[in-house]
Regions:
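Interdomain/boundary linker segments immediately adjacent to catalytic/signaling cores
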Residues: 1-51
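Structural motif
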Residues: 88-90
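Nucleic-acid nuclease catalytic cores
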Residues: 96-101, 111-169
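Catalytic toxin/effector domains delivered as secreted proteins or via bacterial secretion systems
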Residues: 94, 106
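Hydrophobic, Leu/Ile/Phe/Ala-enriched alpha-helical segments that form helix-helix packing faces
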Residues: 42-54, 145-153
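Active-site metal-binding core of divalent-cation-utilizing nuclease and nuclease-like domains
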Residues: 28-43, 52-86, 97-101, 165-173, ...
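Short, charge-rich binding segments
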Residues: 82, 109-111
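Non-catalytic C-terminal interaction segments of nucleic acid-processing enzymes
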Residues: 1-13, 73, 144-191
Length: 191
């Protein structure tokens, strides 16, 4: 089984661009204290914005639909929410450092079934140095890894703080490449 084919010119790509805008503007620092709170907050927002997407918003909090799972390594893995049956998978992770590695691995699994994968990595107050180091360029290997996932694998990552950041610091470090925008791939993550 290979990865689901994905073109960056389709209704799924249009949904991906809208989702990018939504994630960048979502107030993660006010949403909750655990992964389930963040998932519920974002899912509720996406459900209320469903008319902006061409694909159905499917979440685990909406009992009228079911998120499709991916079977890999003898286990079913299910993203937190999707746009469409095979279009876009969204996975939120409330991060400790080990959780970061697990989330990247899950992104690969979901890419088997879905055209695009959005990983939203929510950094806890206790792990704020991960966010600060990524913001200041000290986490170059992590930045390069997330950039590579975006440019070659269609796995788009967003690193967001679950805490209020200092003035002048970004509220979201996103790795999403849109060829419609001007700018080079080297600017990924710098928006």
């Amino acid at each position: 089984m290979g990865f689901e084919p994905a073109r960056r010119a389709s209704r799924h790509w249009d949904d991906a661009k809208q989702l990018d805008k939504t994630i960048r503007s979502f107030p993660f620092h006010t949403t909750g204290k655990n992964e389930r709170d963040f998932e519920t907050g974002l899912a509720t927002s996406l459900i209320t914005m469903k008319d902006l997407f061409s694909s159905q918003v499917i979440t685990q909090i909406d009992k009228s639909s079911t998120v499709r799972s991916v079977y890999c390594f003898g286990k079913k893995h299910r993203p937190d929410m999707t746009l469409g049956e095979s279009g876009i998978a969204l996975e939120l992770k409330f991060i400790t450092y080990a959780g970061l590695k697990d989330a990247i691995g899950q992104g690969y699994f979901y890419r088997l079934r879905y055209r695009f994968v959005f990983l939203i990595l929510i950094i806890s107050e206790q792990r704020r140095t991960i966010y600060e180091d990524l913001e200041t360029g000290k986490e170059k290997d992590l930045e390069d890894t997330l950039r590579h996932l975006a440019t070659t694998m269609n796995i788009f990552s967003y690193v967001v703080p679950a805490f209020v950041v200092k003035p002048g610091t970004r509220n979201c470090i996103g790795f999403f490449e849109d060829p419609d925008l001007t700018g080079s791939p080297s600017e990924l993550g710098r928006s």
